[in-house]
């Protein structure tokens, strides 16, 4: 009798869900998951025979299930109840940390991209520019004491060694970050490092002693939930703070050749929305020029979203910071060429997608676009940022996902 009641309940639940699904319009975008949802596939004979249609239909039904967010939360709690400490590719860790899982990668893709980095470095050297690459470790590779017991994690040192063997000039920031693992250097709910973590990495790259007391630290918001939490939306994990670090708050900032100009690198309008991390550098813009406060020449940063937080620090040391995001920057380097002849330091700050769709061809294209882009100058330097997770798995997709 009890089994019949349970079965009847679930049948009723499924029927109600199906009815609601028919009445509700499909959602295009999930604010919680920060991604586009699968849409209803078109039926074609070839796709039906190949199985493509059934795969797309399964993704569509999964993404468009009514009350999806609630189901995801319920699924996570059920997995926790049976002792699992990993859900949806996320480790559920001590101290309420959620960390992206990273255990395997394509050695072939890693080798190809290491060779491409070495080629880019050589081409820049021919222009009198030295390039340095930073391989940013994932939270799970730094905060190892918080991981579930026996949770596997890819070996950071082995990955870095491949770059070293390819003669890529690198800065190993793992030691600098690990020395401060008891501090809030990564978000609990997001894959990015915090402003504090980015600061320690910047000091390691500059080879200077960290001194946080020199900086004004302003809490921009205290209700932040990141994209990792969106995969595992546990109500027991509290919201966290996003903090700005600066010595001078107002400075001239120009986006995309003057299309939008403002007086701060912090775009506070995002703090009241669902993408609060976008407060840094106005989310992800193709081209940004920032007035600096320092006397160390001009710096070119080629970056991804990790560079948004990082950029708070070089603007205090350089006269101007020119930022390119190659995920969105599709034009030529004419404007960059005019500026580059004045740059004494060039930074290539990448989230190189060695893992998920990053192709070595992008590095080759970067070299082509920067090659010959200005006069040589003594002491020029480039820095490359490579977060681990998207770095090594090969596959299709955007070059910078």
What is each stretch, according to the model?
Residues 1-376, 381-382, 387, 391-395, ...:
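Extracellular glycan-modifying ectodomains
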């Amino acid at each position: 009798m009890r089994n019949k009641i349970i079965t009847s309940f679930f049948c009723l639940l499924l029927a109600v869900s199906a009815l609601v699904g028919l009445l509700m319009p499909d959602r295009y975008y999930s604010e919680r998951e920060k991604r586009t949802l699968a849409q209803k596939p078109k039926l074609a004979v070839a796709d039906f025979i190949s199985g493509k249609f059934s795969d797309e239909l399964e993704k569509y039904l999964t993404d468009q299930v009514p009350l999806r967010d609630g189901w995801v939360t319920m699924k996570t709690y059920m997995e926790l109840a049976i002792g699992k400490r990993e859900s949806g590719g996320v480790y559920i860790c001590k101290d309420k940390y959620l960390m992206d899982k990273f255990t395997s990668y394509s050695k072939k893709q890693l080798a190809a991209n290491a060779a491409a980095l070495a080629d880019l470095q050589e081409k820049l050297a021919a222009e009198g520019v030295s390039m340095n690459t930073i391989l940013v470790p994932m939270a799970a590779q730094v905060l190892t004491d918080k991981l579930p017991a026996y949770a596997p994690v890819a070996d950071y040192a082995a990955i870095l060694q491949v770059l070293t063997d390819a003669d890529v000039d690198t800065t190993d920031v793992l030691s600098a970050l690990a020395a401060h693992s008891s501090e809030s250097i990564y978000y609990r709910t997001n894959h990015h490092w915090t402003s504090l973590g980015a600061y320690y990495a910047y000091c390691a790259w500059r080879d200077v002693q960290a001194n946080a007391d020199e900086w004004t630290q302003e809490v921009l918001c205290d209700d932040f939930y990141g994209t990792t939490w969106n995969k595992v939306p546990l109500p027991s994990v509290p919201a966290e703070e996003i903090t700005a670090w600066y010595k001078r708050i107002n400075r001239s900032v120009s986006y995309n050749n003057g299309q939008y100009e403002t007086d701060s690198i912090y775009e506070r309008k995002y703090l009241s929305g669902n993408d609060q991390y976008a407060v840094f550098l106005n989310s992800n813009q193709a081209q940004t020029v920032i007035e600096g406060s320092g006397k160390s020449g001009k710096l070119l940063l080629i970056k991804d979203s990790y560079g948004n937080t990082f950029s708070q620090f070089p603007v205090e040391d350089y006269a101007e910071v020119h930022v390119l995001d190659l995920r969105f920057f599709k034009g030529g380097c004419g404007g960059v060429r005019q500026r580059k002849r004045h740059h004494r330091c060039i930074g290539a700050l990448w989230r190189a997608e060695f893992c998920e769709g990053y192709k070595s061809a992008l590095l080759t294209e970067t070299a082509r676009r920067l090659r010959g882009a200005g006069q040589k100058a003594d002491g020029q330097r480039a820095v490359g940022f490579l977060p681990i997770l998207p770095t090594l798995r090969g596959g299709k997709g955007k070059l910078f996902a």
